[in-house]
Amino acid sequence: MKKQFNRMRQLANQTVGRAEKTEVLSEDLLQVEKRLELVKQVSHSTHKKLTACLQGQQGAEADKRSKKLPLTTLAQCLVEGSAILGDDTLLGKMLKLCGETEDKLAQELIHFELQVERDVIEPLFLLAEVEIPNIQKQRKHLAKLVLDMDSSRTRWQQTSKSSGLSSSLQPAGAKADALREEMEEAANRVEICRDQLSADMYSFVAKEIDYANYFQTLIEVQAEYHRKSLTLLQAVLPQIKAQQEAWVEKPSFGKPLEEHLMISGREIAFPIEACVTMLLECGMQEEGLFRVAPSASKLKKLKAALDCCVVDVQEYSADPHAIAGALKSYLRELPEPLMTFELYDEWIQASNIQEQDKRLQALWNACEKLPKANHNNIKYLIKFLSKLSEYQDVNKMTPSNMAIVLGPNLLWPQSEGNITEMMTTVSLQIVGIIEPIIQHADWFFPGEIEFNLTGSYGSPVHVNHNANYSSMPSPDMDPADRRQPEQARRPLSVATDNMMLEFYKKDGLRKIQSMGVRVMDTSWVARRGSSAGRKASCAPPSMQPPAPPSELAAPLPSPLPEQVPDSPATPAPALSPSGASLQPTPERPSVSKSKELSPGSGQKGSPGSIQGTPCPGTQLGPQPAASPSQLPADQSPHTLRKVSKKVAPIPPKVPFVQPGTVSDQPVGQPSPVSLSPTPPSTPSPYGLSYPPGYSMASGQLSPASAPPLASPSVFTSTLAKSRPTPKPRQRPTLPPPQPPSVSLSASSPQSTEHPMLDGMSPGESMSTDLVHFDVPSIHIELGSTLRLSPLEHARRHSATDKRDSEEESESTAL
């Protein structure tokens, strides 16, 4: 306590007074002392931040630290997710690999943190909290010793002064000696402490390089940790990529063809094969295939299903338009068209060649230059389109129509140009490329092809919903293939008009031709399958192209009133069972076309059914001739419509009459035919039924005027005299269905109203010659169905006429 008091008094004297003060440290040690404080501050803050960077629990063992590590928790979560999803899925495999990798990374992190904690954090802690504070503590202890020494010196000096003035020298001398010893002892302690402090300070300065190594060690440990982590990641990445590459269920829409084929190991793209195979099962007879737009939601769903290689064949077999839309969408979404950008100019140049043989050869050369993958797929697709064109009478998709709707999806320019140019010149050039390839598919790609390459598509039981709505059947069609009349109506919601005809009617084709662009043959205007083509058959005979030869000739009435001299009607013998014999006269043979009805063929695919109207004055049996005015009042004119028949040029016939009977058809009365045109694909299902194998002349027999036949079913009649000259007829008030550009001559008003014209195909014409002739013999076998009374016929057709009229009204409204 006394020592402490002396220190305080000495310190006060040194501070306030002018007492002697001994210097504790040298100038160099004072600089070291200042640096000690700075190093202590830096080491303390660094230790604190490094400790915060540790993810594990500091000071804990490796096992305990691992449980608290976030990476370990993540790894456990990934492994558990993999077990839930299963190893057979791609996502499950990815989770398992990533979980194992994260667990290894967690172990590396634990090792890294332990090493950092041992080699960096703990040494920094010792430096900041132990070594530097010890030096500072020695510095404070030295300061105390110096104060003690100064205090002892001061007291000894005071004692020495006072002893010189005192008379008793002995006691004063003893006290001074004691203080001198105390002073010397304090000086020794100060010297020892100063030496120790100086050594510690110099040692600190010398060890600064060691302190710097702590931070170097930190970087090295981090580098080693990241190096090991990178090694782990680099080792697992190839495994992850291999799993993804081995997984074949990858999106195919919008992906390069070669990439898709390489991943899936296929020769034909999956969407192409899937769509083609399903269309072969359910869409070959679908009307407007590739042209009718599918439901947007159905198309989106099917595209998504094709992307993941999962297709429900049973579901989409009922919607072939969605399948066709998906195929078109896949072709259009390819980054490069199936016929390639590289060969685009060559394709266009080939299409501009005028000579057909050279053009085909140029197209073949370009086709051979296609890459193997593209060549295989275009071959597969063209072979399918060629097969589809075999059903063009039913599906209305001719090679031209298919080229129109699919051409822009198979080839397009790399640089998008003017939209108008794209829609006119370029589009038609592309159509000119695709159409001949489809038409000559076996020449471009010889040999047969197996469409179902993978065998993974079933053959579901399918009912073609549009199969009941085909247009007029071909005469060559087998009777068993023809549908019943009630099944022969197509839905009005399906567009079936010929696309090129619509383009032609808008005058677009002629504009393009005027620009000097070569376009394919426009003979499509007169195609048999076109509804407008059938309407065009009402044009005057001079407007019709020559007709093809026929297998069997059947007489036709002349479309014009025949100018024959008045002569009394001569009796005609009754028809004998051997057939009707009609002898022609050698006067001005006509080139009028007539049609034959194939055995067993009927109205609109109904086996063994036919309708007919008699020519004015025509008679079968001993009944008077029927005029148009004698038709039942409630009978629809649609019952008089005919089916298409083959024709052959023969002289027109003169209707045979009952002895002493002439036609009582009034003046100006048109022939008994509907003045309201019916859509060609909506035929009337009514008519007389004949057993298969029976045939009639082209002149139609009105069901209402059919006589009851009680006589033998086969009889013969010979007509040797022409009919009397009829009076001029008035022109009908309702114009016939025909293109606007065609005008009818006033000299042939009846040609537009004759019942034969509604059933004629494009390319058929009728004669306008005025001749006298005898009708050749006609062999008719009448079955039991003709033995109905007129009253019974009228009752039958009265009920059906109302239903037909309602259907026509609905068709017209829609």
UniProtKB/Swiss-Prot annotation:
Stretches the record annotates as Interaction with BST2: 727-814
Residues annotated with Phosphoserine modification: S493, S805
Cross-referenced Pfam families: BAR, RhoGAP
Tissue specificity statement from the Swiss-Prot or TrEMBL entry: Specifically expressed in brain (at protein level). Detected in olfactory bulb, cortex, hippocampus, diencephalon and cerebellum (at protein level). Expressed in hippocampal neurons (at protein level).
Signal peptide span: none
Gene Ontology biological process terms in this record: modification of postsynaptic structure; modulation of chemical synaptic transmission; negative regulation of filopodium assembly; negative regulation of Rac protein signal transduction; regulation of dendritic spine morphogenesis; regulation of GTPase activity; regulation of neurotransmitter receptor transport, endosome to postsynaptic membrane; signal transduction
Composition bias, Low complexity: 567-581, 598-612, 622-637, 684-704, 741-752
Extent of motif PDZ-binding: 811-814
Site (Arginine finger): R291
Domain BAR: 14-249
Region (Disordered): 467-493, 528-769, 784-814
Ranges of Basic and acidic residues composition bias in the record: 479-489, 790-805
Role noted for this protein: GTPase-activating protein (GAP) that stimulates the GTPase activity of Rho-type GTPases. Thereby, controls Rho-type GTPases cycling between their active GTP-bound and inactive GDP-bound states. Acts as a GAP at least for CDC42 and RAC1. In neurons, is involved in dendritic spine formation and synaptic plasticity in a specific RAC1-GAP activity. Limits the initiation of exploratory dendritic filopodia. Recruited to actin-patches that seed filopodia, binds specifically to plasma membrane sections that are deformed inward by acto-myosin mediated contractile forces.
Protein name, entry field: Rho GTPase-activating protein 44
Organism: Mus musculus
